[in-house]
C-alpha cells in the first residue's frame, strides 16, 4: 500500500513573493516630457497635463533618497507659470 501522505517535508519549498519592478519610470518620463513641452511651447493644455502628471508622480513617489519628486513638482509649477506669465506681464499698447 502507498503511504497516505506523498509529500516529503524535506522537499517543501516555501513561497517567496516576487519583488515588483520599478514601474514608475514611465510616469516620470512622461511627466518630464510634458513639462519640457509646456515650457517650450507655452501651450496651456500641455501645462495643465504636466502639472497633473507631476502631482500624481509626487503622490505616488517612494521615499527613496535617489529620486527627488519635489523637483519634478517645481518643474510642473514652472510649466504653469511660464504659460500664464505673459498674460500678467504684458501691458496694453498706448494709442
Curated annotation (Swiss-Prot):
The portions of this protein that span the membrane are: 29-53
Ordered alphabetically, the record's keywords are: Membrane, Transmembrane, Transmembrane helix
Compartments, as annotated in UniProt: Membrane
Single Gene Ontology BP annotation? protein insertion into ER membrane
Report the GO molecular function annotations. protein folding chaperone
Pfam families xrefs: ASTER
Q: How does it sit in the membrane?
A: Single-pass membrane protein
Q: Name one GO cellular component term.
A: PAT complex
Keyword Methyltransferase in annotation? no
Principal subcellular localization: membrane
Database matches in InterPro entries: ASTER
Q: What is this protein called?
A: Uncharacterized protein C18B11.08c
Which organism encodes this protein? Schizosaccharomyces pombe (strain 972 / ATCC 24843) (Fission yeast)
Amino acid at each position: 500500500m502507498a503511504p497516505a501522505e506523498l509529500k516529503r517535508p524535506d522537499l517543501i519549498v516555501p513561497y517567496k513573493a516576487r519583488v515588483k519592478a520599478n514601474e514608475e519610470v514611465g510616469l516620470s518620463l512622461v511627466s518630464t516630457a510634458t513639462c519640457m513641452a509646456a515650457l517650450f511651447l507655452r501651450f496651456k493644455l500641455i501645462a495643465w497635463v504636466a502639472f497633473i502628471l507631476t502631482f500624481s508622480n509626487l503622490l505616488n513617489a517612494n521615499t527613496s533618497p535617489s529620486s527627488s519628486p519635489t523637483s519634478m513638482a517645481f518643474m510642473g509649477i514652472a510649466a504653469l507659470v511660464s504659460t500664464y506669465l505673459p498674460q500678467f506681464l504684458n501691458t496694453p499698447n498706448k494709442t
